[in-house]
Amino acid sequence: MLDVVKGNLIVSCQALSDEPLHSSFIMGRMAIAAKQGGAAAIRAQGIDDINEIKEVTKLPIIGIIKRNYDDSEIYITPTMKEVDELLKTDCEMIALDATKRKRPNGENIKDLVDAIHAKGRLAMADISTLEEGIEAEKLGFDCVSTTLSGYTPYSKQSNSVDFELLEELVKTVKIPVICEGRINTPEELKKALDLGAYSAVVGGAITRPQQITKRFTDILK
């Protein structure tokens, strides 16, 4: 899968339960459109969406499950329960929050990575700082993504792509670095790859019409 996405675009097709496009059928259609537009892989949330997207596109999938727990701020594939659920799908890679925050039930992130590898799948580390990226490489993750920059209280807070973190990671770790988070234009995508990103994930700017519409209406205010 890593060979397939190198230098190419990954599109995130997600619509949570409170969003207007929340539907596995709709996400499948969205993924088909992304494939027709040249996406090399899809990042998808939830078992039903993953299964539908795999069936209709046959593209490689980065699978996640977003689930909230009372005893932790981590919600992207937080525990072994979510890993086990994802391993029952045909997703080639599983992404999980690899920040330094405490996991639900005090679970150990290394156990999750080992379980993913034991089933022959790849593991992506969603991180928010350089230090977390370095630790992710030590833990055995196959790639690291800037997904959570700005979403932890101790990381850089910004409304734009964290190109600084991307550059630091590219210079520091040996595993592939994926740029993800707030990429809104083709130019930003190209800049990420020019700075050394192995690949990049674009989500809302392509697959969330309410977000796209708001960018247009905001300029009228």
Swiss-Prot record:
A biological-process GO annotation: N-acetylneuraminate catabolic process
GO-annotated cellular components: cytosol
Keyword Lipid metabolism: no
Pathway: Amino-sugar metabolism; N-acetylneuraminate degradation; D-fructose 6-phosphate from N-acetylneuraminate: step 3/5
Listed GO MF terms: N-acylglucosamine-6-phosphate 2-epimerase activity
Keywords associated with the record: Carbohydrate metabolism, Isomerase
Catalytic activity: an N-acyl-D-glucosamine 6-phosphate = an N-acyl-D-mannosamine 6-phosphate
Enzyme nomenclature, EC number: 5.1.3.9
Main enzyme class: isomerase
The keyword Isomerase is assigned to this record: yes
Functional note: Converts N-acetylmannosamine-6-phosphate (ManNAc-6-P) to N-acetylglucosamine-6-phosphate (GlcNAc-6-P).
Family note: Belongs to the NanE family.
Protein name, UniProt field: Putative N-acetylmannosamine-6-phosphate 2-epimerase
